[in-house]
Amino acid sequence: ICVTMYHVPVLLEESVSGLNIDPDGVYLDLTFGGGGHSREILKRLKDGCLIGFDQDSDALANVPDDSRFIFVNHNFRYLRNFLRYCGYDEADGILADLGVSSHEFDEAGRGFSFRFDAELDMRMNQRSRLKATDILNTYSEEDLTRIFRNYGEVDNVRRLVDLIVKARTEKMITRSEEFLQVIAPCVPKQKEKKYLAQVYQALRIEVNGELEALEDMLKEAERALRPGGRLVVITYPSLEDRIVKNFLTRGHFEGEGEKEFSGHVK
């Protein structure tokens, strides 16, 4: 594992500048990955501290040898607990670059991509138990329908679920190639890649509890930031994007009461 296997950080200058870094401040990089954002933050720190989070153990190989940096190999939803554990009550700035890392997509054995035949794993935290294959083989029809509709926004969800349930009664679905063969009859022509991306996204989100973790993170970030502190979140058009924009523009998630927190979306 090496840094070059991870993507070059997007919006590097814009996101780090958005933190308005105090050289002696305390900062959190919630999506450490290859360490690109963290290295740029460290360049701008003097006696400050940077705490980097990543639940994927592969990221350990990219941790910089710098006394100002602390690495936390856990989900960012627990950021306040670890901030206190590291000896700080609040942070001056928090950065998160959401989504799956290119490293995870490109590691064939992790099962994140339909480009490779591999076990349907999809765990970001390799110590967790639930895998995509568990979902496909044990979830009820109702739960399968829920995740593919809500997390994948799949149009023909009933047909998709019927094919999965029928196939698993004959043989467990464990690998990508098997799964693609099972669902082939319901994959729209000329839209194969988009459809498969939606299906895989739904499984990945369920395996990793991504949306719940994101909501927890945003609530924790609100409480962890000092007055005047900054939260910078990089998102792409997605379910995550909607959650973040609701929180930053309205100070709450849909269906929740107002909170004394607001921000700007660019």
Show the residue positions of the predicted features.
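S-adenosyl-L-methionine-dependent methyltransferase catalytic core, i.e., the SAM/SAH-binding region
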Residues: 2-266
